[in-house]
Amino acid sequence: MSKFEMGQLVATPAALEALEESRQTPIDLLRRHRRGDWGDLSPSDRQSNEEALEDGSRIFSAYILKTGVKLWVITEAQDDSGVRASTCILLPEEY
C-alpha cells in the first residue's frame, strides 16, 4: 500500500552502480520507501517521516545493501499545490 506519491524518480550514477554491485534493483528500495518502511533510521527520524506524511515535508529513508553500502532515498517536500516533485536514490556522501 502506497503512503504517498513520489513524483519523478531519479538516482545518481554512484547509487545505481552500488545497486548493481549488490544485485539489487532501485524498485526494491522505492517500494519499501513508498509503503513506509523507512529502513535503517533512528526513532526520531522515523517519527519525522510519519509527520511528513501529514504536513507535506521531506521524506527520508536509509537502506543497507547486501554489500554493506548505505543508500538514501529522499522524496522532496510538497509544493504549494501539494505535489511532491521527485524522489532521489543517492549515497549519503552525495547529499
Feature locations, PLM:
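Compact soluble domain cores
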Residues: M1-F60
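Short, compact, well-ordered microdomains
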Residues: I59-Y95
